[in-house]
Amino acid sequence: MTRKLKAAIIGSGNIGTDLMIKILRHGKNIEMGAMVGIDPHSDGLARASRMGVATTHEGVEGLTRMPGFAEIDFVFDATSAGAHVKNDAFLRSLKPGIRMIDLTPAAIGPYCIPVVNGDMHLDAPNVNMVTCGGQATIPMVAAVSRVAKVHYGEIIASIASKSAGPGTRANIDEFTETTSKAIEVVGGATKGKAIIIMNPAEPPLIMRDTVYTLSALADEAAIAASVEQMAAAVQSYVPGYRLKQQVQFDRIDTPIRIPGVGNALTGLKTSIFLEVEGAAHYLPAYAGNLDIMTSAGLRTAEHMAERMLATLAVAA
C-alpha cells in the first residue's frame, strides 16, 4: 500500500470543509488526520465526524492534544490572516518541521501559485496560497509577463456573496493587499492592484474574474497563445477554470498616468475575462472561488509530499 502523509485542517468553514472532501476523495500523497474548529456545532466538524475524520472544536491547542498529532506532517490553515500568524508560531514551537499551507492572506511564507512558481517552494516550511482571486488571475498576469514587460496589472474578482464565509469577510483588506503584492512578486507586474466584489445576486452567480495589464508593445498573437497555454495548465487541477472569451488588445498611444508607475505610459492593454466553475464538493458550482483555492492548496501539498516521500524512500 502506498504511504501517505497525514494532514490537519484548521478552520471548519467553507474552505476547510471543501478541502477536506477533496483530500478524502482525491488525495494521492496526502490523507486526512484531523479537522480542527472552534465551534462545536459547525457543519464542517459535523460533516468531518460523519466521514470518519478525527475532530476537535478546541482550536490548535486541541489539535496538539489529539492522539494523532505526532503523525501530522501538514497543516492547512483556513482561518484568518491574524489567526494564522499565531497558529504557525504555536505549532512550530512544538513541531519545528511541520509544513504549513496558508489559505489565508497572512503571507508570512512565500506566495505560491502552482502553475507559476509552485516548484520553487517545495521545501518551504510555510507557503501562502495568496487568495482565491489571486489563484485565478495571477497566472494570467504571468502569462502576459513572460511575453512582454508588464508595467501594471489590475484584477477584479467577483464572487457570490453566499460563498464568502466570515473568514473571507473579515479579511477584505488583507485580500486586496496580499493579492496586489503577489501580482507584482509572482505575476511580474511593476505595479499591481486587486479589487474583490461580493455579488449578492440570487440565484448566486458563478465566480468571474477580469484581468487588465498594460505592457510594453509585443506580438498580440504570442500573448494570446501564452494566455491560452496558461489557462490549460490551471485547468489540469481546476477543471472549471476557463477563458470566457478571446483575449482583447488595445494599443495605448496617448500617454496615460498610473499612480505608482509613471506619468507618461504607453503600450499594449490586454484584457482577459475568466470564469471559474466549482467542482461542487461542498458548496454548489457557483463557488469557484472555493474550488480554485482548495485545489491550488492541495496541488501544492501533494507535490511537497511527493518530494518528502521520495526522500524517505531513498533514506530507507
Swiss-Prot record:
Enzyme Commission number: 1.2.1.10
Sorted keywords for this record are: Aromatic hydrocarbons catabolism, NAD, Oxidoreductase
Gene3D superfamilies linked to this entry: Dihydrodipicolinate Reductase, domain 2, NAD(P)-binding Rossmann-like Domain
The positions annotated for binding NAD(+) are 12-15, 163-171, 289
List the catalytic residues: 132
InterPro entries annotated for this entry? Acetaldehyde_dehydrogenase (IPR003361), Acetylaldehyde_DH_C (IPR015426), NAD(P)-bd_dom_sf (IPR036291), Semialdehyde_DH_NAD-bd (IPR000534)
A Pfam family recorded for this sequence:
Semialdhyde_dh
User: Does the keyword rRNA-binding belong to this entry?
Assistant: no
Enzyme superclass (EC): oxidoreductase
**Any one Gene Ontology BP term:** catabolic process
Q: Which SMART domains match?
A: Semialdhyde_dh (SM00859)
SUPFAM superfamilies linked: Glyceraldehyde-3-phosphate dehydrogenase-like, C-terminal domain, NAD(P)-binding Rossmann-fold domains
Q: Name one GO molecular function term.
A: NAD binding
Q: Which family does it belong to?
A: Belongs to the acetaldehyde dehydrogenase family.
Protein name from the UniProt record? Acetaldehyde dehydrogenase 3
